Each structure stands twice: as C-alpha cells, then as structure tokens.
C-alpha cells in the first residue's frame, strides 16, 4: 500500500493484494471526541490541556476555526492546549463552510461570550441528510433568537441564556453535545430527555465536569445540568477511538490474518466484539489489547445499527467488506442515518461485491425511515471474490472499506480521495503499511 504513481492524483493510494494482515496497532484518542473537547475548552476562563490527541485532519480544521476566532491553540505531539483569551470574536469565517460539523457546536459557547454568534453552513461525511434542526430548536429553547440563511446560522440573545427542558425527537449525538455545551453556562437548570449516551458523549460530560460544570446523568437517557457562572480550564486524556479499533480488527479478519489492537478499552467495544463473535471470530482480550482471528471462516449475520449501546453506525462501513467474505447471505439495516448505506456499498460493489440495496427495513425492527424513500438496508452475498479497481471514495468511513476491500481483492487497485481517510484516521497509510 503506497501513494499512487506520480501521474495519479495526489490524494490516491495504489493498493496491491496484501495477503493476511498481521501485527499490532495502538489507536489514538477518539476523532469523535477531540473536536468537541476543543470547543468545550473555549468556554474556560483558563487554558485546557488534552492528551492522546489523534493526528487527524479534523483536528487541523478545528484548530484553524478556533484560531480564526482568536483562541490560542498549541499542538505539541499528541497534546493540545487551548487558551481562550479575551479577544474571541463571535463569527466563524465563511471560508470554513462545509468542512466539518464543528462550527454548529460553537453557537452556544459564542452566545455565552458575546450574546451573538454566526457559523457557516456545516459539512462532514456524505451519510445522508444531517439537518441542524435539533441544534436550532435546542438553542431557541434556551432563549436564543436563531435565523438560518443560505450562508449559515446566526443567533443572538438578550442577556443570558436560560436553562430549559428539552426532549429530543431522536437521541442525536450532535444535538446532545449542543445542549451540554450550552446548558453548562446557562442560568438555572436544564433537563435533557432522550439524550445520546455514546461513550464520546460521556467523555464530553466528564470534561465539562472537570471544568466546573454541574452535570448529572440519570437513568433513561436523561441529563440534568445546573448552569454555573464560570468554567475554568481542565486537563484530560482522551479514550481510544472505538471506530478505528474496530476497523483494524476487521482489516485482519477480512484478509485472513490477525490484528492486535491496543489503546481502546473493552467496554467501548462490547457490541462490536459480540458481533464479530457471532460471525465466527475468536477474540483474545485483556486489559491492554484486543485481537481477532477466524481460523474456521466467517458466518453471515443479520444486524441493524443503533444508538449506543447498539451497533455503532460508523462500524457498518468496514462490516460491509467483512460480510463479503462471510459464508452465506448477510443483512445490514442502517437506522441512524438515511442513505448512509449507499456509500460503502457503492465502493464495494465496484470491486465485485454482491450487494443489493433496499428502501425497506430488513434485519431488525422497523425504524424511523420505514415510510421514507431512503435506501437503508442491504443484502450482502458471500463469499465474494473481490477484484481490483480504480475507485473514488466518497467519505471517511466508506474510504476505509475501499482500502481493506482492495487489500483482499485480486489484482491492483487505485483508491482516490484518501484525504477523507486522513481527516478521521490517525496516520492511516503508515499504520496499514506496518501490518
């Protein structure tokens, strides 16, 4: 696996069939946690320090966004220090439009600082519709006046944001983050019902507690936050990236090898581990490492993605490739993001994967997309003989699927668009080359 030939695009890799991938990978901190911690640190009255920071593109983008606001950001190896300072401005420049979804999370913190804020249109992976309605509705519940324009979202408030009671229509991770960040400095008590409780959400809540926030998690997806007058800086170490850990375990299994993954605690991987076991994988687990192999081959499975503690939606892309190497007919039902399933399917189909897509709910209970036209279920027939191809990957998660599919395929592949991988995986090229 190498950068592609000189006449190929700069963001392309040439991938030859690898044979069994074997070795050890120690994952860094969670890509889905680090950027939210960086936003939280903006609200502190003193610097915050975060350790075990992954070397991913989203950290670079968020660093640029924060610096454009006047926030000090210093990255030293895998440690980042955020220094809020007194000169923070309330508007994220339009040049950061569409790069990732972090700007929308800045609305609450900027409103606390300036009583007004503007963020440009957000971006992120191509995984179907990802409207900002839940964020906007939550901010309005706190008393903000919010206006959506073609360029972005503008908000203002007269005085201080006020605690409120919010019940999310769906346990959205992003909306839960917006509420936690906004409620921490709001006047009075906020009660958030039907909240997301993913490990990265709990990490954010714990970091805010270290900064002085008063946050309680109650049974039944309920957060209670009592707003405080001021937050201070804090120090924390990020937990390992569970998506990256699963991806490398799957890379070993897909190629008939065995990858040993460290840096991600077992409790963050419970549903991933049980899913691999159902497919016939043998897991070796201790306090430091998780490894998986399948000496007797892989079995087909029916599974649906879900909010935590269910099977993580980000895990479905590498699972697609694993299903092509499992004996029998597998079913995958995506219930979190409409149309997300199209993108990894498109990449794997280009390499010969036998995949049929459906608009109906298969492999699990009926979901919120059951009466829509969204493609959100797939049937995957295995074992498929994948073949090398020239493919362009559309997003981060589908990108890793393309790379590991190319590793097990017959013949050479060129994978374009690997900048998507570098946005979310920690040093992916050198990590894969080490296996």
Range-by-range predicted roles:
Residues 1-435:
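Short, structured segments at the rim of ligand-binding sites
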């Amino acid at each position: 696996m190498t950068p592609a030939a000189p006449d190929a695009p700069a963001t392309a890799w040439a991938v030859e069939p690898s044979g069994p991938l074997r070795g050890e990978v120690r994952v860094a901190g969670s890509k889905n946690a680090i950027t939210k911690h960086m936003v939280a640190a903006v609200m502190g009255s003193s610097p915050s320090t975060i350790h075990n920071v992954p070397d991913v593109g989203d950290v670079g983008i968020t660093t640029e966004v924060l610096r454009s606001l006047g926030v000090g950001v210093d990255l030293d190896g895998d440690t980042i220090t955020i220094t809020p300072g007194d000169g923070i401005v309330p508007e994220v420049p339009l040049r950061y439009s569409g790069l990732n979804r972090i700007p929308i999370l800045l609305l609450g913190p900027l409103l606390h600082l300036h009583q007004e804020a503007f963020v440009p249109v957000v971006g992120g992976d191509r995984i179907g519709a990802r409207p900002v309605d839940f964020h906007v509705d939550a901010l309005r519940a706190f008393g903000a006046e919010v206006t959506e324009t073609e360029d972005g979202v503008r908000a203002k408030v007269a005085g201080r944001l006020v605690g409120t009671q919010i019940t999310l229509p769906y346990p959205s991770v992003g909306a839960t983050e917006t509420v936690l960040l906004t409620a921490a400095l709001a006047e009075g008590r906020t009660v958030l019902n039907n909240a997301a409780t993913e490990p990265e959400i709990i990490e954010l809540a714990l970091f805010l507690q270290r900064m002085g926030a008063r946050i309680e998690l109650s049974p039944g997806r309920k957060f209670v936050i009592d707003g405080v007058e001021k937050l201070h800086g804090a120090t924390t170490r990020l937990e390992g990236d569970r998506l990256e850990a699963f991806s490398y375990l799957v890379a070993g299994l897909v190629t008939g090898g065995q990858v040993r993954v460290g840096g991600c605690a077992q409790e963050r991987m419970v549903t991933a581990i049980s899913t691999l076991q159902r497919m016939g994988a043998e897991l070796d687990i201790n306090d430091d490492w998780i490894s998986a192999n399948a000496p007797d081959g892989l079995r087909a499975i029916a599974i649906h993605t879900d909010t935590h503690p269910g099977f993580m939606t980000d895990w479905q892309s590498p699972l697609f490739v694993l299903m092509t190497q499992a004996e029998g007919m597998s079913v995958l039902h995506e219930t979190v993001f409409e149309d997300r399933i199209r993108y990894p399917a498109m990449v794997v189909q280009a390499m010969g994967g036998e995949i049929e897509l459906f608009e109906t709910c298969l492999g699990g209970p009926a979901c919120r997309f059951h009466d829509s036209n969204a493609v959100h279920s797939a049937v995957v027939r295995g074992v498929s003989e994948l073949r090398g191809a020239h493919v362009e990957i559309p997003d981060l998660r589908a990108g890793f699927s393309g790379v590991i599919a190319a590793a097990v395929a017959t013949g050479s592949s060129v994978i374009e668009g690997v900048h998507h991988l570098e946005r979310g995986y920690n040093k992916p090229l050198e990590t894969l080359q080490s296996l």
